[in-house]
Amino acid sequence: MTVSRRTLLGLALLPLGCDPGKPHEGFLGLTERLNDRMQRALFRPGKLAPEEPAGALTPKGEFPLYKVADDYSAAPAGWKLRVHGLVARPLDLSLADLRRLTPTQFRVRHHCVEGWSAVASWQGVRVSEIARLCGADPRARFVEFRSFERGYPNADASPVRYYSSWDRESVEHPQTILAYGRNGAPMSREEGAPLRLYSAVKLGYKMVKWVDEVVFQPVRTGGYWENLGYEWFAGV
């Protein structure tokens, strides 16, 4: 899966004379920025994705679970979620701490950039609740979610951390959560345990698995796939 994405991206960039390592330069970068602006203009923070019926759940084993590392990542000993950046109160939250916060759940259709979709139920805490707890500064218009997963975006490069940056409006959408459960059961390692980002308003590659850091920041950064030319906003 990872190889095919990189291969297709490289082939797409060759006719444009663009460097796959510098997706924000040249014609491709201009097109992507215009697309992001259009998607942000169309985004409605209060609009919810429709709840799918219970019978629509995709059977276990038929919901693809992607990774960029050689194996599914295991949480390091003493794992905690670190929340920092432009915040009044930096946080270090254990899974037990997160479970004590007001829970939310929804059953929605997941959309992948490859064209497939699937339905799952997700349980967790809204990222807007985390923003409230840490006192996120209004100047932090972007949020970066970081994973302890490491992958190889380029064959000749060192492993890099999986991450994705988001616009603050999408982060605080009521269907954007840090999920610790799926389909009524605790999140499995393959699904992103102990904690993964999930949202009904973004494409799948924006939903970082194995999250260990949330950073509120004033500037937009990139992401593991975004740095390879994938859309930054990636709205559904």
Predicted region positions:
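N-terminal secretory signal peptides and thylakoid transit peptides that target proteins
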Residues: M1-L16
